[in-house]
C-alpha cells in the first residue's frame, strides 16, 4: 500500500533504517510542525528524538525504548538450588547443571524472523566487549576486528554452535519460532529464555506469573 501511495496515516517500522528508506522515497510527511506544537523534543530522550531525524527534519518518533533480556524460571532455579548467574563463570556453571538435568539452557528461535540472529550477537557484544567498546566501533573510533569483538563472537559460537545452548542445537534454533520457544519455556523444556522487552505483554500472557 505504501508503494501504491495508499498507505495508512501512521506507519510502524522495525527501526530508523526502515524509516530512512521511506523518507528517501518521499513516502513520509515531515513532522517538524507537530514536534514544535507538542514539544516532542523536550519530552523525548535526545538520542530517541534524533533517531527519527533525517536531512535535518523529523520523520519518525520511537514507540518504545527496547533491550534484550534473559528470563529464567524462578521456581525451577529454586527447586534445584541454582543461583542466578551474574558472571560468565557462573553462567557456564549453571548451564552445565541445566544440561545435566536434560533441559536446554535457553530457548529462542529464528523461524519467521531471522533478525533474532543480531539479537544474540548484540547480547554478546554488549556483555562481553562492553557497551563502550561497541559505541566506539559504531562511531568509528575502534575497528570491528578488535580482539574483544572477535572473542565475543567466538564465545557465542562456543555456546550456540558447539554446546547447543539455544534449544539444544543450532538446527533447532533455526527451526523454531515464537510459539515454539514460548511453549518450550513454559513447559520447562528450557530453564531460560532470551527475549526482547517489546514482547513483555505477549510473553506474560503466554506464560503467566507461575
Regions found by a protein language model. Name each.
Residues 5-9, 57-58, 99-106, 162-165, ...:
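Loop/turn elements at helix/coil->beta-strand transitions in domains of secreted/extracellular proteins
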Residues 1-44, 75-86, 183-184, 191-192, ...:
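Extracytoplasmic "Venus flytrap"/periplasmic binding protein-like
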Residues 95-97, 139-173:
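Glycine-centered hinge/linker elements that transmit conformational signals in sensory
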Residues 14-68, 83, 92, 98, ...:
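Hinge/lid segment of periplasmic solute-binding proteins
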Residues 30-44, 127-151, 158, 205-209:
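Short, solvent-exposed loop/beta-turn-alpha elements that line the ligand-binding surface or hinge
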Residues 15-19, 66-69, 76-77, 111-115, ...:
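Solvent-exposed loop/turn segments at secondary-structure junctions
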Residues 1, 16-17, 88-93, 170-183:
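Short helix-initiation/N-cap motifs at beta->coil->alpha
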Residues 54-63, 68, 92-142, 190:
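Extracytoplasmic/periplasmic solute-binding protein
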